[in-house]
Amino acid sequence: GFSDYKINLGGALICGYTGVGPDAIVNRSAVKSSVRGEEVALDVLAAAQPKKLYILLGTNTLTTVGAADRFLAYYGQMLDVLRQTLGEDCVIYVESIPPVRPEAAAEKPGLASDIIRSVNEQLALLAADKGCVYLDLWETLADGEGNLKEVLAAPDGVHFSAGNGYGAWVTYLRNHAKYSADNSWTMGSIYSAQ
C-alpha cells in the first residue's frame, strides 16, 4: 500500500506484505515485499531497531469464520517476540483491524462487522497486557453501520483506496502518535513543530 502508492511517511521503514498474519512473524517465515523482495520480516525489524512500530495485519487472516482464536493466539506471541527483539524502548502501536464493505463481508464471512469488532476488543486487551498502544481505526474508517466508508474503499471492498483511504489512515496515525521531539513520523500531525 504505502510503498505502492508513493505515500510520504517521513522516511519510515515500511514492511508491507500481502496476506501476512502474525504467524508469519512468529515462525520467521519468508514473506515478499514489493520494494525489497523476499525477506524475513522479523530480521528486517531487528536490523532497523525502530523506536516506534505500527502494526496493521489480520484482515486477510480472518476471511474464514473460526480463524479468530488462532489469529489472536499468534498475535499475542508476535507481540512478545517483537518486544524481545526490539526492546522495551520501542513503542509498539497495535492498530485495530479495519472494517470492510458489506459486499466484501458477504463473500468472506469471517470479516463480518461483529466478528471484526470482537477481535478488535481482544486486540485492545492484548495491547494493554503487553504494554503496547492500541489505535482504534474504526472512528475514522467506519460509517454509521460499522462498514468501511465507501469513499475510502478500494474496489475489492477490503483494502483502502489509493487516495482517500490511505490518506485517512495516515492522517489518523499522525494525529494519534505519542508525541516525541525526535519522531519525524509525526510530521504534519497537530503536534509537529513545522
Regions found by a protein language model. Name each.
Residues 1-8, 75-76, 90-92, 116, ...:
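Short intrinsically disordered, low-complexity coil segments enriched in acidic
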Residues 42, 79, 120-124:
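Short amphipathic alpha-helical segments and helix-helix/interface helices
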Residues 1-73:
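Conserved SGNH/GDSL esterase-like catalytic core that processes O-acyl groups on lipids
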Residues 46-49, 85-87, 128-129:
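Extracellular/periplasmic catalytic domains that process cell-envelope and extracellular macromolecules
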Residues 68-78, 116-119:
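Charged helix-capping and loop-helix junction motifs
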Residues 99-194:
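Catalytic His-Asp segment of secreted/periplasmic serine-dependent ester chemistry enzymes
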Residues 54-62, 81-118, 138-139:
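Active-site segments of SGNH/GDSL-like serine hydrolases
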Residues 43-44, 77, 81-85, 172:
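A generic secondary-structure signal
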